[in-house]
Structures are given as C-alpha cells and as structure tokens.
Amino acid sequence: MWKADPMVFDVQVEVMLREGISDPQGATIERALPALGFGGVSDMAVGKNLRFQLEADSEDAARTQVQDMCDRFLANPVIEASRINLMPASA
C-alpha cells in the first residue's frame, strides 16, 4: 500500500496564563516600566513562545500531535492556555 511522504510544518505555540490566574512576572514588569519612562502600559502578560518543525502525514495530524504535546508537556492545562499556529515549512 502506497503512503505519501510526510509533510513538514513550521509550528509556533504560544502559552499564556489563563484568565484569572495571577501573573506576578507581568505585574512586576508593568510596575517597573513607568520608572524607566515608559508610561501607559497596562494588562502586561508574560508567557512562552515555542517554535519548531514537525513532520506529519497531514495538517490535521500535525495539529492533533501538537495539541497533545501542549496538553501533556508544553503547558500546564490547569493554569495555562495554548494557541497553535501551523504552516507548511518553507523550502
């Protein structure tokens, strides 16, 4: 049985604290910026941005695999939410 070659995807995952979860890093940065002359900043949030390439048979398979990575390891689903951006890798 013939099987297509896997596709390569550029993956970007943004992991942020869920709404209502205290963000002490964000609060510290927000308080410090005015002292450095940067006023008008509010709602500062700190998170993680992960970028990698992934081989998968299809975009759906890649998205499912990345979501599983987020749920099991890359994010703490109790306090963090993840957003996945998936694109075919540039040659």
Each predicted region: which residue ranges?
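Long, contiguous binding/interaction regions
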Residues: 1-49, 53-91
